[in-house]
Structures are given as structure tokens and as C-alpha cells.
């Protein structure tokens, strides 16, 4: 079992009400730490009425409170709704309106879950903030490093690439060395009712998976129709609003043609969705912005061969990277990759170690 330092130290645990963070709280409590549970109320629960398996909903806050009561630890629910809307939901909506495919879970980790919650944990006198993420914090020759979770099926390193080295020093991830089954067995050993609670799915603030309704509620004129144009220049029909399309999409285009067509580009300025054959989706290189680099000892101004992930569900692909200014990098695949979508994350790995990452821009070739 992972031991997080001296007994009787104060550790804040970010408790979502799920099995992972509950197991972390129980583990640390058993080790003798002074555990404080904090659950964040992130959005209007009414928006998620009827949605099952969504994190941070009303049931999850109740479950976190019940776990804390069973363990006999203090538990606080913090209203972060306005911060969450400003940092995550508004960014999510604006990203779709810009023809991008956003990744709100990364924005949430980067802002309210780490930046703001670390500040709160420090104010409470905690020596660490522990979470239920499946990643590992490893001590390297040049300081702390972020590594993939030991269980590749549950690894969440892709979603934590924006974590800074300063934040990483303060954070702890006890489940990085566990499989999901081991976590559930641990929770069961502690007698936690959430031991076999289903994992959260999809985006927590999107009712029934219908993100379009969220966008249209916040931006009522979001679904403005426009042209669908073939990449060869001729019009094929009209679309129902660029928020309804993403790079690589094939279904639901509503157009007839003599070969399968895919969304290959979205132009928000002129409100155009461009389509083309599958071959048009292949990308050799692209630019990422707002790069967070965690490997200070590696001279990132040189060309490096690494592995990169452009979607959480895709395996890493070999690529060469080179620095462009202070916060941009060029990524060049060793062999072309399909459907690189602006707004998604590109995370850079050297084996199991996360070197850094950034956001995919429109500069795609």
C-alpha cells in the first residue's frame, strides 16, 4: 500500500463521491493522516436531471458525505459553480463556436480542481492534496515527474498534462500503482458502499450527453445554418450549425455523394463545414499552443523523437517535436495520423513519462 509520508500530517482529499477518491480517503485515514474531504459543487444540478453516471451530481455529493461520515473525517462542500462556469463551461461553449472540439475535463483539472483547490488546501494547512487519478508521481534525477498509471486501461495522464511542476510537488496520486479492481477491493475492505458504484461517464455538466442543448442555452444563436462545401470547391448542401460537427465525423452530414465523405475542416469565420474523402483526414504535422513542459532538463529547443497522443482513447504515435517560440511546438508524425482536431490536447511522452503537452491549433497540414 502507498504511504504518503509522516503520520498525523494533514492531507486534503478531493472527494467526488466515486470509489476512487473514497478509497484514497479511507487509505490515508487508515495510515493515520488527518484527512479532510472536500467535494466541489461545480454546476447547477438541475441541468443534469435524469443523467446517470455523471460526476459531481447531487447523488455524488451525498455519497462523498456518507463516506466521510463513515470514516469520521471532516467534509466540506464548496460552491465552485461560478468559477466552473467561467473557467470550464464558457470555454467549452466558445470552443465549439470556434469550430473546435473541446476537452473540458482538462480545463477543469487545470483550473478549479488543481489551481483553486490547491489554494484552498494550503489555506487549511494541508501538506498535500490527494486525488483519485490513475497517474504516478515519480522522483527523478531532476525532480518530480508525471508518469502514466500502472494500469494502462485506467491511465489518466492525458487529462493532467497541464499540471505544473509546482502543483505536482504538492499533489499525490495514491492510486497510480493500482488497478481498478484493486481499488474496488480496497474500498470493499473498508466497508464503503460506493465500492462497486459505476464509473462516471461523459461530461458532468452535459445532460443526457446532449452538449448542443447546453451550448444553445448559453448562446441562443449558436446553431446558425451555413454551407457544406467539398474540399474541391463545390457546394453540397447546408449544415445546421458548426457546433453539430467535428473533425472526422461521417454520420449525420445529411448529404448524398458517390463516396463516403467526412468533415475535414470547419471554418467558423465564414460558417462553412468542409468535407472530403477519408484520405483528406490524414495529417503529417500540426502546431500546438500553450505548451506546458515538465521536463526542464530536456532541451526542448532541439528536435526530439517522442510519442504523442492526440485523443485519450488513441495509442501514442511516434513523432518529432520542435519548439516554436515560448509556448508553441511543431509536431510531425513519423507516419500520417487521421482526424487531428483543433481544440483537443496533444500530450507528449517518453516511455511512461509525460514530458508535456499543448492544445492543437488550426495550423494543421
From Swiss-Prot:
What CDD domains would the database entry show? MnmA_TRMU-like
Marked site, Interaction with tRNA, at 133, 344
Single GO BP term: tRNA wobble position uridine thiolation
Residue stretches in coiled coil: none
Report residue spans for region: Interaction with tRNA.
154-156
Q: Tell me which Gene3D superfamilies the record gives.
A: Adenine nucleotide alpha hydrolases-like domains, HUPs, Translation factors
Give the chief site where it resides: cytoplasm
> Where is the chain membrane-spanning?
none
Q: Where does it live in the cell?
A: Cytoplasm
EC number in record: 2.8.1.13
GO cellular component terms given for this protein: cytoplasm
Kindly state which reaction or reactions the protein catalyses: S-sulfanyl-L-cysteinyl-[protein] + uridine(34) in tRNA + AH2 + ATP = 2-thiouridine(34) in tRNA + L-cysteinyl-[protein] + A + AMP + diphosphate + H(+)
Residue positions annotated to bind ATP are 14-21, 40, 132
Q: Which HAMAP family match?
A: tRNA_thiouridyl_MnmA
- Family that this chain belongs to: Belongs to the MnmA/TRMU family.
- What is the protein name for this chain? tRNA-specific 2-thiouridylase MnmA
What is the native source organism of this protein?
Rickettsia akari (strain Hartford)
Amino acid at each position: 500500500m502507498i504511504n504518503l509520508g509522516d503520520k498525523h500530517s494533514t492531507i486534503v482529499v478531493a472527494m467526488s463521491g466515486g470509489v476512487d477518491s473514497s478509497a484514497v480517503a479511507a487509505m490515508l485515514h487508515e495510515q493515520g493522516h488527518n484527512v479532510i474531504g472536500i467535494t466541489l459543487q461545480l454546476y447547477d444540478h438541475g441541468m443534469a436531471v435524469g443523467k446517470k453516471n455523471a460526476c459531481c451530481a447531487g447523488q455524488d455529493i451525498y455519497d462523498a458525505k456518507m463516506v466521510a461520515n463513515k470514516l469520521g473525517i471532516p467534509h466540506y462542500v464548496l460552491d465552485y459553480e461560478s468559477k466552473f462556469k467561467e473557467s470550464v463551461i464558457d470555454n467549452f461553449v466558445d470552443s465549439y463556436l470556434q469550430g473546435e472540439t473541446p476537452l473540458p475535463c482538462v480545463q477543469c483539472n487545470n483550473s478549479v480542481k488543481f489551481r483553486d483547490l490547491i489554494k484552498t488546501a494550503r489555506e487549511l494547512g494541508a501538506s498535500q492534496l490527494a486525488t483519485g487519478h490513475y497517474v504516478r508521481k515519480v522522483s527523478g534525477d531532476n525532480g518530480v515527474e508525471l508518469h502514466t498509471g500502472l494500469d494502462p486501461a485506467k491511465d489518466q495522464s492525458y487529462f493532467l498534462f497541464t499540471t505544473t511542476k509546482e502543483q505536482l510537488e504538492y499533489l499525490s496520486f495514491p492510486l497510480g500503482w493500482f488497478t481498478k479492481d484493486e481499488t474496488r477491493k480496497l474500498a470493499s475492505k473498508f466497508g464503503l458502499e460506493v465500492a462497486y458504484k459505476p464509473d462516471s461517464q461523459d461530461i458532468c455538466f452535459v445532460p443526457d450527453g446532449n452538449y448542443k442543448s447546453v451550448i444553445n442555452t448559453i448562446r441562443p444563436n449558436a446553431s446558425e445554418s451555413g454551407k457544406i462545401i467539398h474540399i474541391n470547391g463545390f457546394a453540397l448542401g447546408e449544415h445546421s450549425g458548426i457546433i453539430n460537427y467535428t473533425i472526422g465525423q461521417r454520420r449525420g452530414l445529411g448529404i448524398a455523394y458517390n463516396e463516403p465523405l467526412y468533415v475535414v475542416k470547419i471554418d467558423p469565420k465564414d460558417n462553412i463545414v468542409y468535407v472530403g474523402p477519408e484520405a483528406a483526414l490524414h495529417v503529417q504535422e500540426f502546431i500546438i499552443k500553450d505548451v506546458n513542459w515538465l521536463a526542464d532538463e530536456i532541451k526542448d529547443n532541439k528536435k526530439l523523437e517522442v510519442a504523442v497522443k492526440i485523443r485519450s482513447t488513441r495509442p501514442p504515435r511516434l513523432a518529432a517535436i520542435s519548439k516554436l517560440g515560448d509556448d508553441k511546438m511543431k509536431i510531425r508524425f513519423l507516419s500520417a495520423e487521421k482526424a487531428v482536431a483543433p481544440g483537443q490536447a496533444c500530450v507528449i511522452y517518453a516511455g511512461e513519462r509525460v514530458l508535456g503537452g499543448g492544445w492543437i491549433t488550426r495550423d494543421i497540414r
